[in-house]
Amino acid sequence: MAVGKEILTKIRSVQNTQKITKAMQMVSTSKMRKTQDRMRLARPYAEKVRTVMSHLAQTNADHGIKLLEPHREVRRAGFILITSDKGLCGGLNANVLKKFLAQVQEYQEQGIEVEVVCLGSKGLAACQSIGLNVIASATNLGDTPKMELLLGPLTEIFQRYEKHELDRIHMVYSRFVNTMRQEPRMEVLLPIGENVIDDGTGHSSFTWEYLYEPSPIAVLEYLVRRYLESVVYQALSDNMASEQAARMVAMKAATDNAGNAIKELCLVYNKSRQAAITTELSEIVAGAAAV
């Protein structure tokens, strides 16, 4: 019965693993709901900032704000790469990195230099392993990321755009569609598109006027920063919701696979036990017949 003992050991090992994956599935389900709530709560703020910024930009065309000025030629491109800090979330990070690296390769073939800001340890490790120029990073962001952790890296890359050290900035992350679907997304963060500097109604001007202190330009310059930060935070929240959804699905699949493995091992154990009993009975009968 040495074989039977080995099978029992494997069954217990798989059962222990199943308990872990089941617990991780339940934790991911709870965290996913919280990240979805955070996404919904962050959206109204970003929309209101965009609305006020649009009004100020349209009524102050000669604002002279560098973050709103497009660069004529792209010689250097920057990326804000958003990935998770932890694994066990299926192909989530792999899909984001695939989209990111495809664009990086395209730029490199055109002779365009690339610089990267990494939010998340998985993206940072991938960029370092292939020798990309990482100018700033933020890792170990936790389940509830704080804007204070993002300000340093974001300020670094935005200042490079203002100084014309970067001509375009992309943001790459995983967009949360639903529990079963998360899609890699790449957006141009800078220069800010004309669709952003619009009131969203198709009209090119606003009928309402406000007085801004200390001046409309000063307020606009402040809001542009806040808008960009809110867009990145929204993308980070999307990515975290995608991470928890992907992990929940992956852990459910692992739990189901563990259950199937336990059934198969139990079947093998019962067959080996039955064969051992049959052999013993045959030996007893043969011994009795010999007597």
PLM region spans:
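C-terminal beta-strand-loop-alpha-helix "lid" module of Rossmann-like NAD(P)-dependent dehydrogenases
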Residues: M1-V291
